[in-house]
From Swiss-Prot:
MF (Gene Ontology): metal ion binding; ubiquinol-cytochrome-c reductase activity
Gene name per UniProt: MT-CYB
Name by which UniProt lists this protein: Cytochrome b
One annotated Gene Ontology cellular component of this protein: respiratory chain complex III
Record field: transmembrane: 33-53, 77-98, 113-133, 178-198, 226-246, 288-308, 320-340, 347-367
Bilayer topology term: Multi-pass membrane protein
UniProt keyword terms in alphabetical order: Electron transport, Heme, Iron, Membrane, Metal-binding, Mitochondrion, Mitochondrion inner membrane, Respiratory chain, Transmembrane, Transmembrane helix, Transport, Ubiquinone
Lineage: Eukaryota, Metazoa, Chordata, Craniata, Vertebrata
Length: 379
């Protein structure tokens, strides 16, 4: 008798995606982050749903409704901090997932990669709008500063900003629409994830060597399901340590002050996971130039397949490219640090140098080194 999981119309899809899926036998722990991102998304949707049951998207009551969740709702504090720190875990997994893709040349799967970059943009938009909802000082001023950047667009900029605001400043209309978008976007992200997986399963997974692994495949279950469960347990452990011991470690103290349009905080900065892009934005003195650099700092990921000059797919056997990759990682950490610092000497010049280095490594150095490595192969 044929197994139900192989014949049932719905079970069949699950079976081909998570059970009988042929996976390369040598994929390392770096391939765990896809499933961890799925776990993060599910957790964020679930905790977000429970928060939305008690939250009010009104400027007069938003801040106090978050306080009410933390003080009066059963385990409200836990749900709130799981949601806030869950976003941080989400971005840690995202950055590691993207980094893995860059290191092992997974970007040669064009469709999967480009959908992934669109997903990154969608998650960043979701996180930004979520940060505005508690209506603290940093929520309000973060929303004001970031939305105001659109006014740099020639001719239609000012009209566009006022249209997004729903008035002449960030106010009730802005908060309400941000809440609506913050609620709907994760479901759009979930739909895009399905498309991401659809394209991935057309080609099959990449592996650390970057070689075709059709001759050496093993079933996803039980080998990689058990491996993913281990990753999930470590993720939950890290998250719960963060939530239960230092829930405000990654937050901003200014957000415990209710939003006040008449009082600007001394240092306006976004959450830590946006600091690298914020540093690139601030490093350019021109407003429009800064906005373009900000967008391009993420959009540049889409150009990686075009910039791939090496005869080898993965960086596993390319020590020179490996050096550049880790310099790029160090550069991104430097940008993250600079994004959280005030705009004064020596941080300005460090930020500018780190921004130049970021684009130089990706656009010039990696392709050049790849060509040199191709030459070295002939020796």
């Amino acid at each position: 008798m044929t197994n139900t999981r192989k014949t049932h119309p719905l079970m069949k899809i699950v079976n081909h995606s998570f059970i009988d899926l042929p996976a390369p036998s040598n994929i390392s722990a770096w391939w765990n982050f896809g499933s961890l991102l799925g776990l993060c998304l599910a957790m964020q949707i679930l905790t977000g749903l429970f928060l939305a049951m008690h939250y009010t998207s009104d400027t007069m009551t938003a801040f106090s409704s978050v306080t009410h969740i933390c003080r009066d709702v059963n385990y409200g504090w836990l749900i709130r901090y799981m949601h806030a720190n869950g976003a941080s875990m989400f971005f840690i997994c995202l950055f590691l997932h993207v980094g893995r893709g860059l290191y092992y040349g997974s970007y040669t799967y064009f469709e999967t990669w480009n959908i992934g970059v669109i997903l990154l943009f969608a998650v960043m938009a979701t996180a930004f709008m979520g940060y505005v909802l508690p209506w603290g000082q940093m929520s309000f001023w973060g929303a004001t500063v970031i939305t105001n950047l659109l006014s740099a667009i020639p001719y239609i900029g000012t009209i566009l900003v006022e249209w997004i605001w729903g008035g002449f400043s960030v106010d009730k209309a802005t908060l309400t629409r941000f809440f609506a978008f913050h609620f709907i976007l994760p479901f759009i992200v979930a739909a895009l994830v399905m498309v991401h997986l659809l394209f991935l399963h057309e080609t099959g997974s990449n592996n650390p060597s970057g070689l075709i692994s059709d001759s050496d495949k093993i079933p996803f279950h039980p080998y990689f399901t058990i491996k993913d469960i281990l990753g999930a347990l470590l993720l939950i452990l890290t998250l719960m340590i963060l939530v239960l011991f230092t829930p405000d470690l990654l937050g901003d103290p200014d957000n415990y002050t209710p939003a006040n349009p008449l009082n600007t905080p001394p240092h306006i900065k976004p959450e830590w996971y946006f600091l690298f892009a914020y540093a690139i934005l601030r490093s350019i003195p021109n407003k429009l130039g800064g906005v373009l650099a900000l967008i391009f700092s993420i959009l540049i990921l889409m150009f990686f397949p075009l910039l791939h000059m090496s005869k080898q797919r993965s960086m596993m056997f390319r020590p020179l490219s490996q050096c550049l990759f880790w310099i790029l990682v160090a550069d991104l950490l430097t940008l993250t640090w600079i994004g959280g610092q005030p705009v004064e000497h020596p941080f300005i010049i460090i930020g500018q140098l780190a921004s130049i280095l970021y684009f130089s490594i990706i656009l010039l150095m990696i392709p050049t080194i790849s060509l040199i490595e191709n030459k070295l192969l002939k020796w």
